[in-house]
Amino acid sequence: MPSQTPIITLTPELQVQLKEHTEGLLNNIIHTNLRTRFVQEFDGLRKFRDAFELLKDHSAHETWECYRDSVPLTNYSTYEPFISRFLAEPCREDDVKDILSPGLPFFIAKSSGTSGKAAKLFPKYRHFIGTAPSRNPTAAKGCHILSMTYLQVIDVLRNEGNSTKVVVTASSSGTVRMQHDLTIEKDAEVIKMTLPNTTSPIAVGHIRNYRSFLLMHALFALAEENLTFFYATYSTLFLDLIMFMEEEWATLLNSIENGIIPDFEDMHHVREYLEPKLLPNLSRAQKLREIGESKGESGWLFKIWPELQQVKCIVSGLFATTIPKIRHYLGPEVLINSRGMGASEGYIGESCSFTDLNLFKLATKEFIEYLDIMKDPSPANLVPAWEVETGRRYEVFLTTRDGLWRYRLEDIIEVAGFDSGDGIPLLRYVERLK
């Protein structure tokens, strides 16, 4: 969040600070991915390769100038011939190692196809922060609506004769797996566990039936009176959970009273792992029955969970239409917080305000450039973070740790100002490129 009141224009000192930071970020990304297959084989980077070899000291500023003048714009079709190597049968390590970033990806993110377009695949690699921070085991619990399912498992054959498994899954699921080092090889053991400070056992995340998946998250959340947060990818996911919970209210309360997992669809493969996790709780069930008399009223969820502090999910863009309904369910006491602005390709901005849910502070893990929407898409028209102007709208281009170079994201943002502490731009999501 902004350290102080946002400013409209960067001071000279903050502009220099932001420039040095951003150039350093780009320098690290380029030096990390310089020897990858994509950089060495993609003909569009030939000019960059030749120019980079002639640099004297490869300083951050020198690297930025080389990149600025020689790297073309790219889109998904640029990477598809390289990413498609993961789909070959057999998939051999020699063919896919160091494709976009060093080593093998931890998982491959599959974007959801929109506007009739086919879904896209993006290899995701483990970087310096590979595991999630430890949590206080005595802290209050929350419901993290998380799926652990995957769409495909790719067996990458190693030269030694063994293989490594790489899952194709949603970016949210893959990221949590990567943060907690939950490789698919560990699933048989991990499925018996519950992550720290979360209400739902990991086995719930292995339910593929959408309704059953959300109902089981609801069941374990209802059983926890001292619930403090809900985390969901999208606001619609949270609202669907509440809707299904209302529909199956009596069944869920009977399960809590008797400690019995309900017989919802497509749960046979996880039932044995869930049954030991739900203990009979007559008093909780009775209290919920009393609360159920006001089901659907404003603030109803706060009556169920009087310790609830926030619901965190994507509520910007098209999802902003869900905010009034969420606020009705929560009442005035509970905060609604945005999860940030991002895509399968990369993370753009961090949540910046509890009152303005479409305000984000530029994330500092990827190098982001901006194209004024009134200008033609060309490398010469891109500007870096230290040259954007408040009030202007830009199309976003990403150069990422996972190996994308000036990738056209087709998202439009508006610059809302700058953090007065470090000069980082503040952004608002506007729309997809039409």
Residue ranges and their predicted role:
Residues 34-38, 91-92, 101-104, 113-117, ...:
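Short, solvent-exposed loop/edge-beta patches enriched in aromatic
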Residues 24-28, 38-108, 120, 130-132, ...:
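Active-site diphosphate/adenylate-binding microenvironment
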Residues 1-55, 59, 67, 92-93, ...:
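Active-site glycine/GP-rich loop and adjacent strand/helix microenvironment
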Residues 100, 123-128, 138-139, 191, ...:
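Beta-propeller domains
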Residues 75, 79, 103-104, 128-131, ...:
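Phosphate/oxyanion-binding active-site loops and adjacent basic polyanion-contact surfaces
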Residues 106-140:
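Conserved AMP-binding A3 loop
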